[in-house]
Amino acid sequence: MSLIDPRAIIDPSAVLAADVEVGPWSIIGAGVEIGEGTVIGPHVILKGPTRIGKHNRIYQFSSVGEDTPDMKYKGEETRLVIGDHNIIREGVTIHRGTVQDRAETTLGDHNLVMAYAHIGHDSVIGNHCILVNNTALAGHVHVDDWAILSGFTLVHQYCHIGAHSFSGMGTAIGKDVPAFVTVFGNPAEARSMNFEGMRRRGFSEEAIHALRRAYKVVYRQGLTVDQALTQLLEPAALFPEVAVFRDSIQASTRGITR
């Protein structure tokens, strides 16, 4: 029995693995590649160039690989690359890149993108991230591994969301969020660190305590960023987790959420 519903429309140039499932009324355009074990639900639109890896599931009414609405876009060939084992829920929109950046939007592996979330052009999402319902990423946003953006989180273009960070519901992020930091509010403010997430992922208590001390250096001692980075040199040499935190601050181009 065919795994492709006869009511689906698939461009002859699209490349689908033999066991890909496609639901009714979905449209798969030219230049789309889909890896093995992936399930495309009903009423999904996939536009290329888009490469989707293995064992993904895309739910109904999602639009994946559409042209960017960026006013600079003039029809140049750009792409979307999606890795493996992602879940993309109902009504999600993901746009391809622009030639002014990498010409590519990237979604890594093992991510959960929940209903009505939006991933803008040229954004780069790592692995094991969760974008909760109605989260919206503007263009050129980077989200590192294990970050969680709660429902209705808004992220300004070019922001960098650090690994293992967490945003509360309705947070509006306009500056970079360092690794491990939790942010809340509109505009976003740093409140603490994602200690519960660290414990769930097996971080040692020693590493968690070191990060707690590092957070206080940056956010509680009234230091400038440069002064705080200097004070973190020694603990960063002892704890790789503190090094990740410090590096994410040092790499910031928009300034960090305070």
Curated annotation (Swiss-Prot):
Gene Ontology terms, MF aspect: acyl-[acyl-carrier-protein]-UDP-N-acetylglucosamine O-acyltransferase activity
Q: Which reactions does this protein catalyse? A: a (3R)-hydroxyacyl-[ACP] + UDP-N-acetyl-alpha-D-glucosamine = a UDP-3-O-[(3R)-3-hydroxyacyl]-N-acetyl-alpha-D-glucosamine + holo-[ACP]
Query: Which leading EC class covers this enzyme?
Result: transferase
Transmembrane stretches in the record are: none
Q: Write down the InterPro entries for this protein, in alphabetical order.
A: Acetyltransf_C (IPR029098), Acetyltransf_C_sf (IPR037157), Hexapep (IPR001451), Hexapep_transf_CS (IPR018357), Lipid_A_LpxA (IPR010137), Trimer_LpxA-like_sf (IPR011004)
Highest taxon of source:
Bacteria
* An annotated GO cellular component: membrane
Q: Which SUPFAM superfamilies match?
A: Trimeric LpxA-like enzymes
Q: In which pathway does it act?
A: Glycolipid biosynthesis; lipid IV(A) biosynthesis; lipid IV(A) from (3R)-3-hydroxytetradecanoyl-[acyl-carrier-protein] and UDP-N-acetyl-alpha-D-glucosamine: step 1/6
Which biological process terms from the Gene Ontology are attached to this UniProt entry? lipid A biosynthetic process
> What EC numbers are recorded for this enzyme?
2.3.1.129
Localization in the cell: Cytoplasm
Keyword set, alphabetical order: Acyltransferase, Cytoplasm, Lipid A biosynthesis, Lipid biosynthesis, Lipid metabolism, Repeat, Transferase
Task: Name the NCBIfam families for this protein.
Answer: lipid_A_lpxA, PRK05289.1
Check the record and name the HAMAP family matching this protein. LpxA (MF_00387)
The entry's family comment says: Belongs to the transferase hexapeptide repeat family. LpxA subfamily.
Subunit relationships? Homotrimer.
Q: What PANTHER family does this protein's entry cite? A: ACYL-[ACYL-CARRIER-PROTEIN]--UDP-N-ACETYLGLUCOSAMINE O-ACYLTRANSFERASE, ACYL-[ACYL-CARRIER-PROTEIN]--UDP-N-ACETYLGLUCOSAMINE O-ACYLTRANSFERASE, MITOCHONDRIAL-RELATED
Q: What does this protein do?
A: Involved in the biosynthesis of lipid A, a phosphorylated glycolipid that anchors the lipopolysaccharide to the outer membrane of the cell.
Protein name (record)? Acyl-[acyl-carrier-protein]--UDP-N-acetylglucosamine O-acyltransferase
Provide the species name. Answer: Pseudomonas fluorescens (strain SBW25)
Taxonomy, top ranks, is:
Bacteria, Pseudomonadati, Pseudomonadota, Gammaproteobacteria, Pseudomonadales
Encoding gene, per UniProt annotation: lpxA
